[in-house]
Amino acid sequence: MCTTLFLLSTLAMLWRRRFANRVQPEPSDVDGAARGSSLDADPQSSGREKEPLK
């Protein structure tokens, strides 16, 4: 009985974490995509500019 309750509680915690993680990234993906694209473009452009100078 104790083992069964432990397994069920563990599975419940894992499922809660998975569903919570899936719900949160959806709105943050929109913000992160806009921020990430601008941040990704800056290092790439600066890296490309440094290579021809060398």
Curated annotation (Swiss-Prot):
It is found in: Cell projection, Cilium, Photoreceptor outer segment; Membrane; Endoplasmic reticulum; Golgi apparatus. Palmitoylated at Cys-2. Palmitoylation is essential for protein stability and trafficking to the photoreceptor outer segment, but does not appear to be essential for membrane localization. Probably palmitoylated by ZDHHC3. Phosphorylated. Residues 25-54 are annotated as: Disordered. Involved in vision. Changing residue 25 to T: In RP36; no effect on protein level. It comes from Homo sapiens (Human). It holds the Pfam family Rod_cone_degen. This is Photoreceptor disk component PRCD.
